[in-house]
Amino acid sequence: MTVERPPESSVEPAQPGGPGVPRPIVAGVVGGVSVIVIALSAWLALRPGAEKAQTGLVHWFNDPPQPFAALFAVANPFLRPVPLAVVAIVLMGWVLLTRPGSAHRLAVMRAFVATFLLAQLMTQVLKHVANQPRPIHVIPDLDTHGYPTSPHGNAYPSAHTAVVVAAVCALWPWMRWPQRVAGLVFAALTACNRIYIGAHWPIDVVGGIAIGLLSGAITWLIAARWPIQETR
């Protein structure tokens, strides 16, 4: 007499922390690489002649050829401080509306707030460490393209880039593919815009991207270690 075994479920066990939250090893690799990039980019930013080496690329972004000129000009009004914050909040709201269950929504909000605070903290600390002037204070006749105020503080790293990349990275596990595409476009345009208006050097943007990825990776670890359970 043979005993039939119950069929095995074809459904894979859910990842801890929510749908698609990367495993701790993945978050650790992303975070580790980001730390290396931050250290290397900060070192390069402080090297003698760093501004001169990047001047040509700054000129290209400040007065780019078509179709980049048209693309940057259209995106520019939406990437100023207030519109940028609105776009980021709208992106988070879009993700919230498409995630079922209060636990997922709470996880999204926790990730968004945590990554914002982490990115801001890291950028402000590094701005006090890296004493690098902004391109508009070094290169004459740069076009700010209507930026409402003169950027304050040191150039390295780009806080705007760091925060936007951090938000997209942190929310990535809960995003559907259209939201991921929109997030990547948003982050790429923000990074390019910071050079376009003369507020940052390319190395500042590289540092900002790395800080954003590190902040996002930390929120992945938080989501995996302390998942928010659905209440009944």
Language-model features: locations:
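Membrane-embedded catalytic cores of phosphoryl/pyrophosphoryl-handling enzymes
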Residues: W94, P140-R232
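Transmembrane alpha-helical segments of multi-pass membrane transport proteins and ion-pumping complexes
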Residues: Q120-Q124, H128, L213-W220
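Transmembrane helix-loop junctions in multipass membrane proteins, especially transporters and channels
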Residues: L46-A50, R99-A103, H128-I136, G198-I203, ...
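Interfacial segments of alpha-helical transmembrane regions
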Residues: P24-V33, V90-M122
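Aromatic-anchored segments of alpha-helical transmembrane domains
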Residues: V37-S41, L117-Q124, V185-A199
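Hydrophobic alpha-helical transmembrane segments
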Residues: N76-R99, V163-V164, V168
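N-terminal transmembrane-helix/juxtamembrane module of multi-pass inner/ER membrane proteins
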Residues: T2-V87, K127-P148
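Membrane-helix interface segments
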Residues: P67-F68, S102-V108, I136, M175-V181
